[in-house]
Amino acid sequence: RGVAIVGVGLRLPGGVDDLESLWDTLIRQVDTLRPIPPERYDMASLYDPDPDARGRSYVKHASLLDDVASFDASFFGISPREAAPMDPQHRLLLEAGWTALEDAGIPPDTLKGTTTGVFIGMGPNEYGQHRGRTPGDVDAYDVTGSQMSFAAGRLAYHLGLQGPALSVDTACSSSLVAMQLATEAIRAGKCEVALAAGVQVLANPQAMVLLSQTRAVAPDGRS
């Protein structure tokens, strides 16, 4: 059974938000690497070029999205209270998923009640730590807005889908695994259409510090 990619939604570093801008970035060999800004997290106090320095990171550059917190919550029927603790990864999935359907020429409302599936490859939630919430501050929206398990369900719920919806974290291969699962589901007849996505937002320095301890990242931040 043949499977085709019919639409794409992108949110990538360097202002890339469609295939045309992605192609332009590649052709012009645009370098999207930049110093991690303090509004993302305070990398300056954690940086140390010595890879053996405990509790420090020898990386201070990354390719990052601009204005990652920007989100039109009302467009998706989400209240300000619910949107505030929502992991930017959830927000990006909603936006990119909607864009992918538009790019495919599929009116989103025509998928309501169908067996369309949602398959998400997602990085860990760092936004909760970034916000610095305490147990006394949290409410139900801190749970629904932060857990990886809710990410695929949120997109499926918004579109009224009845197909399989799941999120996976297989580290660097998460996006490819999501695409493979979507392909298998279509070929098995579990769904006619599938949204497959990958998302990761660096919002807390802890992962960078831990990866530096294992020397799993390049000093220049490129891999």
Model-predicted segments: where are they?
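Cys-dependent condensing catalytic cores that perform Claisen condensation/acyl-transfer
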Residues: R1-S223
